[in-house]
């Protein structure tokens, strides 16, 4: 590094031509990388010094000769090529001599330097950045596996996300300041979308390769998390830009549906090739389901139309998990069904939809599908290829949430039907609806208690207790304020009947405690 500082000083004082000085600095950096290679071959303790100094010097010279107004000598194409060459040399050193340091400095350094090259006073060209970051990720993931190198992969992913957000910022900032520049910003949008899509495919391939090659206890957190994180980052940034610029939004959401289907195809292919007990499929399946949930409402034109399809997709996914013997896919199906129901609650509470018939149809479909989903889960034990079912939920108690989702959808269906039967101009309409809601909740709870008793099903009994608690909270903390007269009397009476039924059934249940069929 002393020689490098001498070269810089001589160049600054004009003793040698600046262009010649820059080229000498690049040549000296390559020389240090070469010396580092041969030092590693001889197992010299000084080898890391040459490799690190050569890599750092290369990145400093390339960025300065491109950005510094004194130079501006190195165009973007050769600058990025030099970064890639230095990264390849560092990765080759790691691969040949089984040492971590060259890979760490080489890949992370080239990614950082490539991002720095975009911090230019003029409009930067991000197309070269795509190639360099892709090369850094490939080198970081496909170079020989070494212990304690996970931070390199996380760093590369973080830098890739930061670079895309920086790119999006450079595209959208002029538009936010001056809307008339939107036309020129739209010209950059296809390149941004192509770059984000390319990285999405790359990370999917990386995760699939690791899942196929690894074993259950060796698949790291990074490879399990990267598909979902990629969907959140890639779809989120693309959705934001296309929405603000009002361009390619529908196309991006439709393409996302296709990509979500590709995720399921990848899961199917991996399930055919993996060894027994090998996990990791749920990571890719979860990413595909998330992409489906994010993009389908836009493609359908209304969220209320998309929710029944999401519910059906969740049911299909648990059947798919049975064929694949994937506990991860099964857990994803639970989450997707819960998401659809929670989204339905959000739409109804915020009154985002004003079509009663559409709501009734959606609630009816989701009630039926959620219950079928629950029945399938209770008829088929979950695979234990993921830690969730192997350690935390061995008896699949989480499937009870599916029955709860069916009850929620059914409640809104019946509540919508009763609301439609009561004229909007009727006096005391709100109080009447409040009383009817309590009757629906408490009546459902009483029915569940009887169903659980005659079916010897503890799970349904426990859910009935939860529903009764919800009904009681509604009666005493809402109905006493919002209702009066006959609706209030009926509301309180319905809760009393439900608790009476529960009390009688619970007293008789004690006689059946020793029955083997009672277990859920």
Describe each region flagged by the PLM.
Residues 1-520:
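Alpha-helical multi-pass membrane segments and their bilayer interfacial helix-loop junctions
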